[in-house]
Amino acid sequence: MIRAVFLALACSSVGAKEIQLAAPFTDNMILQRERAVPVWGSDAPGSEVTVEFAGQVKAAKADDKGDWMLRLDPLEASLTERVFRVRNNRGQSHDLKGVLVGEVWFSSGQSNMVWTAGKSMCRDLASDLSRAEKEVPIREININTVSALYPQKKATSEQGWKKVKEAGGFSALSLSFAHELYRELQVPIGILLSAHSNTRIEAFTQRQAIESHPGLSDDKNLIHDADPLTEQGRRAFEQYYADLEAWQEIAGNAAERGGKAPGRPNLPGIAGMWRGPSQFFNGKIAPVIPYAIRGAIWCQGTSNSGDGRVYASRMEALVRGWRDAWGMPEMPFYFTQMQCYGSPDPENVGFADIRQVQHLFFMNNRENVGMVVQSDLNSANPGGIHYFNKLHPRMRMARWALAKDY
């Protein structure tokens, strides 16, 4: 009897499992042209999943963990909205509507990448695009922020792929980049945005790339101290719990005497952080890999402005990690050099130091890398780091892409 109930519950659990798609696969998505297109998600183990799009029919079987992946053959660019159908052998299906094929770029960084078009010099562009009688095929998806110690499979996006009617809420730098590409290429342009304000570069970097870079031992140790699956992590947590036990006794005695308790011991490494090395890569980049893209654009540096030359090592690890994770060893990577900031002061160089290090990185890593100078576009602003002119820097970045990739 018990065995029968258990089997019934198990079958019910399998039956209740629904076919799911990875976060970038929503209505109105843009797929990368001229490349194999990975499609993946989850379902009950053993389920057969079929994808139908643009005359292709591809199938895959969910593994023991319920994960499945297939690849569409390279697609031609198309301005025609079509249905992307996903179904399984249990009668479940998803029809994604309004799907286009064109160019897709991954976009990341901190607050100046997050900054919306409606609050920048791109606002007129955004207004014109949102009110255009004929819709311009520029779309953006923004991946929600999750911090994690290990790479995650799933992510979320509040709105999925947004059409250009909502351009005022797009990333300003990404919108101007996409618009410049569209003007020249006349194909749909998609922006896969995974950025977060006030965040250091190492948070967006793949763990293996940090571990393998000889100049990033401090970042590596922060990760290993927090990972109980490593010997270093086990020792760090043993020490933490010993310190915590001692602290509890000291704090208790202090409280009994009416005194002030000392500060509680910190968790080891990045365990007590949420924007530490690799945490945003794990939580909000890994889940969208290997969505097919042409390349990546990057705007960041404020939170690392005191790094000195180690920032060049961190940029090297960022690029190598992304290229490795996507399986694109020649992935194009274009970035903005830091803007001017602060009033002229011999005691305060503003961002001059990190601009120099960004230039050093660029000179030593020229393969499919481009740097956009913007110090002539955004003058020093003592009042804030969020510069207004986000129109022209990304137009310059688009020129890198148009010259090198098209």
How would you name each of these model-derived features?
Residues 1-7:
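Sec-dependent signal peptide recognition
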Residues 7-15:
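Hydrophobic h-region of N-terminal signal peptides that target proteins for export
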Residues 17-406:
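Cell-envelope and extracellular/periplasmic
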